[in-house]
Amino acid sequence: VDEKQNRDRVKQDTIVKDFENWAQNKNIKFDGLRHEQFEFLGSKIQGIKALGKVDAGKQLVQLPKKFTISTYVSEKCPFPGWISNSFWDKQPNYIRLALKLLWEKKLGENSAVQAYVDLLPDPENLDTLYYWTDEELDLLRYPVLKNSVLRQRKEWDELHKQLVSSSPGGAEGAPAPEELAWALGCVLSRAFAGARTGLQ
């Protein structure tokens, strides 16, 4: 294990500990779960481990709504000085969530969910197929999958162009292409849909 890997592991351990302390202080309940490093294909990946048997229907996590990043179809744009209302109104929920995630990242220490945002992987540590080179995709020998990735890249590039052209601050105010791709990747691998009833 080289020095950089050791530094990265110490940094990740600190981020996880800070997140867990923040969650407990905010009355976020996750009894019976803990963060864990798992061996996967010769490397370690971060995940969640259940500390015992999980019965069907058991509630695993409970948190106040103010500590979620969420949206709904009729929601008005929460940051019209940054993203135009016309752009926001046309977007599906997963794109809205990505924009909200970027906004929280932009807020930094002023974000109510900074500890969660810090827990997300850095752009250079995302390893989804979106980030593979064309040569690496060719190694899969699965043209349908490669074409799907290329289509996603094209769609996200087009989305970014639309975002910039409709942004009140233009290119300088809008997220960079790599920032948007990072947020979309995080949302698509973590978000879920649920009923809004009973949220507080």
Task: Report residues per predicted region.
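Long, positively charged leader/targeting segments at protein N-termini
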Residues: 1-67, 72-75, 105-200
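E2/UBC-UEV (E2-variant) core
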Residues: 85-91, 95-103
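Short, compositionally biased
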Residues: 71-88
